[in-house]
């Protein structure tokens, strides 16, 4: 799996700027006000062939005992515990501060590898900037500039040297590999135990975190399967925002290794933003998806109707997925859930013949033509499959850039129905044929061809022959003179 790198440091040393550099995004807010990043943001990046996750923490104020800064410090310590490597960021302009020393004392107690990065080092003497930070006893300081990128590549390259090359993606396995994902304490491990029929995973009635996801191989009706459980062996502890946030990283890691994701929701709790975030990542990754609404037996009929309304409102983008209302503890609804997992896997790995895809496309266009965009009406000619997991359909034609989102949804539903693609995202790509008359004014004009009569061609050919004969005679004369001397 991808290693997770946590960015640690006191407020306003440039963690969010470095985060943006490492992920090539602007997901974390960047401002000169200390403490602006009050929770952890997470993203992923890649150096060469090695991918990684990165967490941008809030500023670490270790001397504060209460209030929001104290909560930020708790989240930071949680990130250190869960990360595979820590980048401790200090400010090269401000220099070494007492807060830096306190944070360094905490980090030296951590079993995680810590890399000291002296930020805002652009334009300065590296040796001078790094000198005073040797006092922190965290190894060789790396002088970098998060804003300009100086030294960042070499820092991350050194961190990733200690992690093995990524293995081949299990998502391409020849059997279903499904990840059980969701927020803490929604019943993921209980569901895994119910599917396996034995208590292979320790589960407590208390939310916690895990160092590693657990891969469990098993057979069902003679067929091989692999479950990736993101709950794992839990630590007893208070459920706080840090635990909630870090569950996203675990879900992201598991989803990338799976070809089906099982999203577990808690019927006794409201649908949270965290649920939508995890579901959205599975959708973005193109994974087949099944949703298990757990603890269904413990709520009233009125509450059940409310949960269904919340799901349709907050998780509307999962209209392709099959929803199951289950009780993992009492093992109710598990058989139907497993049937949907198998069906979603089959749909994600489907191979669709090109003639049938094209026929479905033509029928859809005959039934409802794409609307005009100004004077242009898109013309669709044929389609073929462009990939699996998720299935991709490539449509060829003219002026396809004018296709509206609503018409793409219409085509998606048409293809989904024709090929029974329940439980998997379906992506449609448009391959636009180049129009030779488009932007004709901007293209260099070719010289017009002149018509040449047959008599003119003969005259030119005879002229070339005469010229060639004269050249041969001159050459013979010059050669004779040369050897006669």
UniProtKB/Swiss-Prot annotation:
Subunit structure: Associates with the 50S ribosomal subunit.
Region (Disordered): 435-485
Keyword GTP-binding among record annotations: yes
Residues that hold GTP 2 according to the record: 182-189, 229-233, 294-297
Basic residues: compositionally biased ranges: 470-485
Binding positions for GTP 1 per the UniProt entry: 9-16, 56-60, 119-122
Gene3D superfamilies in UniProt: 3.30.300.20, P-loop containing nucleotide triphosphate hydrolases
Family: Belongs to the TRAFAC class TrmE-Era-EngA-EngB-Septin-like GTPase superfamily. EngA (Der) GTPase family.
Stretches assigned to the KH-like domain: 350-434
Limits of the EngA-type G domain: 3-167, 176-349
Pfam families: KH_dom-like, MMR_HSR1
Keyword S-adenosyl-L-methionine: no
Effect of disrupting the coding gene: Essential.
Coiled-coil ranges from the UniProt annotation: none
Alphabetic keyword roster: GTP-binding, Nucleotide-binding, Repeat, Ribosome biogenesis
InterPro entries: AAA+_ATPase (IPR003593), G_ENGA (IPR031166), GTP-bd (IPR006073), GTPase_Der (IPR016484), KH_dom-like (IPR032859), KH_dom-like_a/b (IPR015946), P-loop_NTPase (IPR027417), Small_GTP-bd (IPR005225)
Record-level Gene Ontology MF annotations: ATP hydrolysis activity; GTP binding; ribosome binding
Protein name listed in UniProt: GTPase Der
Gene Ontology annotations of biological process type: ribosome biogenesis
Signal peptide from the UniProt entry: none
Role according to the record: GTPase that plays an essential role in the late steps of ribosome biogenesis.
Biased composition (Basic and acidic residues): 457-469
